[in-house]
From Swiss-Prot:
Shows antibacterial activity against S.uberis. Its main location: secreted. Signal peptide: none annotated. This is Maculatin-3.1. It comes from Ranoidea genimaculata (Brown-spotted tree frog).
Amino acid sequence: GLLQTIKEKLESLESLAKGIVSGIQA
């Protein structure tokens, strides 16, 4: 459903943000 799609997109954005942050800190 729509909520599942939104949840998956939020999770992928979160992991992307974490990757960017760790890239900045490295």
